[in-house]
From Swiss-Prot:
Pfam families: Phospholip_A2_1 (PF00068). It comes from Echis carinatus sochureki. Snake venom phospholipase A2 homolog that lacks enzymatic activity. Shows high myotoxin activities and displays edema-inducing activities. Has cytotoxic activities against HUVEC cells (LC(50)=12.2 uL) and human lung adenocarcinoma A549 cells (LC(50)=8.5 uL). Keywords: Disulfide bond, Myotoxin, Secreted, Toxin. One of its GO terms (molecular function) is phospholipid binding. Negative results: does not show antimicrobial activity against E.coli and S.aureus and does not produce appreciable hemolysis on human erythrocytes. CDD domains: PLA2c (cd00125). GO terms for cellular component: extracellular region. The lineage of its organism: Eukaryota, Metazoa, Chordata, Craniata, Vertebrata. This is Phospholipase A2 homolog ECS_00014. Disulfide bonds join C26-C115, C28-C44, C43-C95, C49-C122, C50-C88, C57-C81, C75-C86. Its main location: secreted.
Amino acid sequence: SIVELGKMIIQETGKSPFPSYTSYGCFCGGGERGPPLDATDRCCLAHSCCYDTLPDCSPKTDRYKYKRENGEIICENSTSCKKRICECDKAMAVCLRKNLNTYNKKYTYYPNFWCKGDIEKC
């Protein structure tokens, strides 16, 4: 769920998801128009694409369990949906950490109408 995703983002990046990522660029927090603005925004596109592979799941509301061992996120076994949601969220949090150097404050609260052009395919 968005609760666990938020915790993972804090643990991996040290940034609060709100406002850092909730309205970042063209893909973080919804909108999904135009090409990603940078590698951070591309992490959000990849996360959206991952969720698209889970049509029978409820990734924003299904709660799941995970733990951290030696600094790594471990998705705990539960239902197939919850495990797959956790893996999508983990991939996003790790991607955001790996791309912290591309994070640009000017893309926070980026107006969605500025996102123009063809949407990048998954």
